[in-house]
Amino acid sequence: LRVGDAVALRFDEVINGEIDIEEQKTGKRKSLTLPAPVMQMIARRRAEFPHDVHVFRSQRNRSMNKQAPVRREEVSKQIAEAAKAIGIHGTVSAHSFRKAGGNAIYKRSANNIALAMTVLNHSNITDTRRYLDIDKQAVSRVINEMDL
């Protein structure tokens, strides 16, 4: 999920461990089965904040009695601050997790680009190759394996 879709998630969109949403960026439908740890987190949040509409409502919105999710910009800001605090330098944002997740799926599936493309909800393979830097990875791997 893109961070904007994740923070906009409402409790009523989580049904039997699955979500079916319309992506904000593309307008395409996306269905996902949520892992057990995510479902446990959602259940804890629901129990702690039974009147919230959104799974990720900020403390500020809650104190102002505003039914709105946390802003994606705030999530990226918090991630960047956390990365800096543990010594990770450079650009780190919520989007970094989407790219890392896509790369992890690609590598764990024996380089199944079609699976990565499906998970990322890309319309064409060219976008997925560019997104995952596959050409760059392949060239680097071949060069490193050369016996010069």
Q: How should each PLM-predicted stretch be described?
A:
Residues D5-V7, V92, G102, A110-N121:
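Active-site-proximal segment of tyrosine recombinases
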Residues L1-Q40:
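Conserved tyrosine-mediated DNA breakage-rejoining catalytic core shared by Y-recombinases
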Residues S31, N65-E74, T91-S93:
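N-terminal core-binding DNA-recognition domain of tyrosine site-specific recombinases/integrases
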Residues Q24-N65:
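Basic, alpha-helical nucleic-acid-contacting "clamp/cap" segments
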Residues E23-G27, L120-E145:
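Catalytic-site neighborhood detector that most strongly recognizes the C-terminal catalytic loop/helix
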Residues H89-I105:
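Short basic/aromatic active-site micro-motif
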